[in-house]
């Protein structure tokens, strides 16, 4: 019986105001179905905001799927920063419906070692009953 083989490679470049990364993965699960993934993402920092984008493709036995995300952060909104983003929930085929997830958050530094980030998200659903959630993340640095 053949086992599962997984190979991957990633290359990235980062400068002061921008960065880009490319990733490739090949998954052979021991059957005739081999899956390959390609991903490209990057960011650019403007004076007033930074933007991040990414795209991923997946090919399994002739079926192509893709997904993407985009996010924007405004670093100087009051004492904290505001982030908004949207992206596909997973890779989807061209003929499939595209369900998105939207998110927004505000990161507020309490002191030099603690940051609180409240946020909200909306996740579209095929049934029309979208999921909505609220989160609060607390980060500590020592």
Language model: regions and residue ranges:
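Detector for outer-membrane/organellar transmembrane beta-barrel domains
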Residues: 8-101
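Loop/turn elements at helix/coil->beta-strand transitions in domains of secreted/extracellular proteins
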Residues: 80, 113-114
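CBM-like carbohydrate-recognition segments
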Residues: 103, 107-109
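Outer-membrane beta-barrel "beta-signal"
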Residues: 108, 114, 120, 130-142
């Amino acid at each position: 019986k053949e086992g599962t083989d997984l190979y991957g490679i990633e290359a990235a470049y980062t400068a002061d105001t921008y960065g880009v990364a490319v990733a490739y993965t090949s998954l052979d699960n021991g059957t005739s179905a081999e899956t390959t993934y390609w991903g490209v993402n990057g960011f650019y920092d403007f004076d007033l905001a930074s933007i991040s984008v990414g795209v991923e493709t997946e090919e399994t036995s002739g079926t192509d799927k893709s997904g993407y995300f985009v996010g924007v952060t405004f670093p100087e909104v009051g004492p904290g920063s505001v982030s908004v983003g949207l992206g596909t929930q997973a890779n989807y085929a061209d003929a499939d419906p595209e369900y998105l997830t939207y998110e927004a958050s505000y990161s507020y530094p309490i002191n030099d070692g603690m940051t609180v980030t409240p946020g909200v998200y909306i996740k579209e659903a095929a049934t029309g009953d979208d999921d909505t959630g609220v989160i609060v993340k607390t980060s500590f640095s020592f």
